[in-house]
Regions:
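Hydrophobic pocket/interface hotspot
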Residues: 61, 72-74, 81, 97, ...
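Short, low-complexity N-terminal intrinsically disordered segments enriched in polar/charged residues
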Residues: 19-67, 71, 75
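A short gly/proline-enriched turn/hairpin at secondary-structure junctions
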Residues: 44-48, 82-92
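Low-complexity, intrinsically disordered terminal/linker segments enriched in charged
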Residues: 27, 166-181
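Surface-exposed, charged secondary-structure patches
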Residues: 101-146
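Positively charged n-region of N-terminal signal peptides that target proteins for export
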Residues: 1-4, 19-20
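Exposed beta-sheet edge and beta->alpha loop/turn motif
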Residues: 131-172
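C-terminal motif of bacterial Sec signal peptides marking the signal peptidase cleavage site
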Residues: 14-17
Length: 181
Protein backbone atom coordinates (compact mmCIF):
# COMPACT_ATOMS: atom_id res chain seq x y z
CA UNK A 1 0.00 0.00 0.00
CA UNK A 2 2.87 2.33 0.87
CA UNK A 3 4.39 1.73 -2.60
CA UNK A 4 1.05 2.59 -4.24
CA UNK A 5 0.85 5.90 -2.37
CA UNK A 6 4.42 6.75 -3.37
CA UNK A 7 3.68 5.81 -7.00
CA UNK A 8 0.58 8.03 -7.12
CA UNK A 9 2.48 10.86 -5.43
CA UNK A 10 5.27 10.65 -8.00
CA UNK A 11 2.73 10.53 -10.86
CA UNK A 12 0.92 13.57 -9.45
CA UNK A 13 4.23 15.43 -9.18
CA UNK A 14 5.17 14.56 -12.78
CA UNK A 15 1.77 15.61 -14.12
CA UNK A 16 1.80 18.90 -12.21
CA UNK A 17 5.37 19.56 -13.39
CA UNK A 18 4.31 19.06 -17.00
CA UNK A 19 1.42 21.49 -16.52
CA UNK A 20 3.78 24.10 -15.09
CA UNK A 21 6.12 23.72 -18.06
CA UNK A 22 3.31 24.48 -20.50
CA UNK A 23 2.20 27.56 -18.60
CA UNK A 24 5.85 28.66 -18.29
CA UNK A 25 6.24 28.45 -22.07
CA UNK A 26 3.09 30.49 -22.51
CA UNK A 27 4.49 33.13 -20.15
CA UNK A 28 7.82 33.22 -22.00
CA UNK A 29 6.02 34.04 -25.25
CA UNK A 30 4.56 37.19 -23.73
CA UNK A 31 7.78 38.31 -22.03
CA UNK A 32 10.76 40.01 -23.62
CA UNK A 33 13.61 37.53 -23.95
CA UNK A 34 17.12 38.89 -24.46
CA UNK A 35 18.51 37.32 -27.65
CA UNK A 36 21.40 39.61 -28.59
CA UNK A 37 22.65 43.15 -28.86
CA UNK A 38 23.37 45.98 -31.29
CA UNK A 39 26.52 48.03 -30.93
CA UNK A 40 26.96 51.54 -32.37
CA UNK A 41 30.61 51.85 -31.22
CA UNK A 42 29.62 53.94 -28.19
CA UNK A 43 26.77 51.96 -26.65
CA UNK A 44 25.39 48.45 -26.61
CA UNK A 45 21.60 48.01 -26.91
CA UNK A 46 19.60 44.91 -26.06
CA UNK A 47 17.80 43.00 -28.79
CA UNK A 48 14.76 41.03 -27.61
CA UNK A 49 12.11 38.91 -29.28
CA UNK A 50 9.80 41.07 -31.41
CA UNK A 51 6.24 41.27 -32.65
CA UNK A 52 5.26 38.07 -34.48
CA UNK A 53 2.67 40.03 -36.49
CA UNK A 54 5.56 41.80 -38.21
CA UNK A 55 6.68 38.45 -39.66
CA UNK A 56 3.26 38.22 -41.33
CA UNK A 57 3.72 41.71 -42.81
CA UNK A 58 7.02 40.62 -44.34
CA UNK A 59 5.39 37.42 -45.64
CA UNK A 60 2.65 39.50 -47.28
CA UNK A 61 5.34 41.77 -48.76
CA UNK A 62 7.12 38.90 -50.54
CA UNK A 63 3.84 37.15 -51.42
CA UNK A 64 2.90 40.37 -53.24
CA UNK A 65 6.17 40.17 -55.22
CA UNK A 66 5.42 36.54 -56.12
CA UNK A 67 1.94 37.56 -57.26
CA UNK A 68 3.50 40.43 -59.26
CA UNK A 69 1.27 42.79 -57.28
CA UNK A 70 3.58 45.78 -57.00
CA UNK A 71 0.70 47.96 -55.82
CA UNK A 72 0.43 45.75 -52.72
CA UNK A 73 4.21 46.05 -52.21
CA UNK A 74 3.86 49.83 -52.56
CA UNK A 75 1.06 49.91 -49.96
CA UNK A 76 3.17 47.88 -47.50
CA UNK A 77 5.92 50.53 -47.56
CA UNK A 78 6.15 53.99 -46.05
CA UNK A 79 6.32 56.70 -48.70
CA UNK A 80 9.86 57.56 -47.55
CA UNK A 81 11.06 53.94 -47.36
CA UNK A 82 14.83 53.57 -47.45
CA UNK A 83 16.24 50.34 -48.90
CA UNK A 84 19.91 49.40 -49.29
CA UNK A 85 20.41 46.85 -52.10
CA UNK A 86 23.34 44.40 -52.23
CA UNK A 87 24.72 46.09 -55.37
CA UNK A 88 25.14 49.44 -53.56
CA UNK A 89 21.94 50.99 -54.92
CA UNK A 90 19.86 53.00 -52.44
CA UNK A 91 16.10 53.23 -52.91
CA UNK A 92 14.74 56.36 -51.24
CA UNK A 93 10.97 56.19 -51.75
CA UNK A 94 8.14 53.75 -52.32
CA UNK A 95 7.59 55.36 -55.74
CA UNK A 96 11.22 54.71 -56.76
CA UNK A 97 10.88 51.12 -55.54
CA UNK A 98 7.64 50.65 -57.51
CA UNK A 99 9.30 51.90 -60.71
CA UNK A 100 12.36 49.69 -60.18
CA UNK A 101 10.16 46.71 -59.38
CA UNK A 102 8.22 47.17 -62.63
CA UNK A 103 11.48 47.15 -64.62
CA UNK A 104 12.80 44.12 -62.73
CA UNK A 105 9.65 42.06 -63.24
CA UNK A 106 9.46 43.03 -66.93
CA UNK A 107 13.02 41.73 -67.42
CA UNK A 108 12.60 38.65 -65.18
CA UNK A 109 9.54 36.58 -66.02
CA UNK A 110 10.75 33.80 -63.73
CA UNK A 111 11.17 35.90 -60.57
CA UNK A 112 10.31 34.15 -57.31
CA UNK A 113 10.95 34.92 -53.63
CA UNK A 114 10.86 31.88 -51.33
CA UNK A 115 11.06 32.60 -47.59
CA UNK A 116 13.13 29.96 -45.82
CA UNK A 117 13.06 31.52 -42.32
CA UNK A 118 11.99 34.74 -40.61
CA UNK A 119 12.40 36.23 -37.12
CA UNK A 120 11.10 39.42 -35.51
CA UNK A 121 13.16 41.38 -32.97
CA UNK A 122 13.00 44.64 -31.05
CA UNK A 123 16.07 46.82 -30.54
CA UNK A 124 15.69 48.67 -27.23
CA UNK A 125 17.51 51.98 -27.57
CA UNK A 126 18.03 54.32 -24.62
CA UNK A 127 17.40 57.70 -26.29
CA UNK A 128 15.02 56.85 -29.14
CA UNK A 129 12.00 54.61 -29.67
CA UNK A 130 12.35 50.84 -29.83
CA UNK A 131 12.70 49.56 -33.39
CA UNK A 132 11.03 46.39 -34.71
CA UNK A 133 13.17 44.51 -37.25
CA UNK A 134 12.25 41.36 -39.17
CA UNK A 135 15.22 39.42 -40.50
CA UNK A 136 14.31 36.95 -43.22
CA UNK A 137 16.21 34.36 -45.25
CA UNK A 138 15.00 34.21 -48.84
CA UNK A 139 15.88 32.14 -51.87
CA UNK A 140 15.47 34.49 -54.86
CA UNK A 141 15.23 33.11 -58.39
CA UNK A 142 15.15 35.31 -61.48
CA UNK A 143 15.62 35.17 -65.23
CA UNK A 144 14.00 35.77 -68.61
CA UNK A 145 13.27 32.09 -69.11
CA UNK A 146 13.92 28.73 -67.49
CA UNK A 147 17.33 28.42 -69.21
CA UNK A 148 18.59 31.78 -67.91
CA UNK A 149 17.16 31.43 -64.40
CA UNK A 150 19.61 32.00 -61.54
CA UNK A 151 19.13 31.79 -57.78
CA UNK A 152 20.76 33.63 -54.89
CA UNK A 153 20.43 33.53 -51.14
CA UNK A 154 19.41 36.77 -49.45
CA UNK A 155 19.09 37.90 -45.88
CA UNK A 156 16.68 40.81 -45.78
CA UNK A 157 16.50 42.95 -42.65
CA UNK A 158 13.37 45.13 -42.67
CA UNK A 159 12.35 47.70 -40.06
CA UNK A 160 8.59 47.55 -39.56
CA UNK A 161 6.92 50.71 -38.28
CA UNK A 162 3.15 51.14 -37.98
CA UNK A 163 2.54 47.96 -39.98
CA UNK A 164 4.70 48.99 -42.96
CA UNK A 165 8.30 48.68 -44.15
CA UNK A 166 10.27 51.79 -43.17
CA UNK A 167 13.87 50.73 -43.88
CA UNK A 168 15.71 47.69 -45.15
CA UNK A 169 19.11 46.15 -45.73
CA UNK A 170 19.48 43.38 -48.30
CA UNK A 171 22.53 41.08 -48.10
CA UNK A 172 23.17 38.54 -50.85
CA UNK A 173 25.46 35.64 -51.71
CA UNK A 174 25.72 33.29 -54.66
CA UNK A 175 24.63 29.72 -54.08
CA UNK A 176 27.13 26.90 -54.36
CA UNK A 177 26.40 24.17 -56.91
CA UNK A 178 25.01 21.76 -54.29
CA UNK A 179 22.61 24.43 -52.94
CA UNK A 180 20.98 25.33 -56.24
CA UNK A 181 17.34 24.31 -56.60
Amino acid sequence: MKKLIILFSVLALIISSCDNTVSSNQNIESKAVLIGYENDNTSKYNIVNGDINSVEIVKAYFDAYNNRDLQAVYELEHEDVLLYAPNGMIIESSKQHLEGGEKFLAANQFAKWEITWSISTHVNFENKPTENWVTTGILVSSGKDEASKTSVSRVVDLMIQDGKVKKGYIHQRQLSENEKP
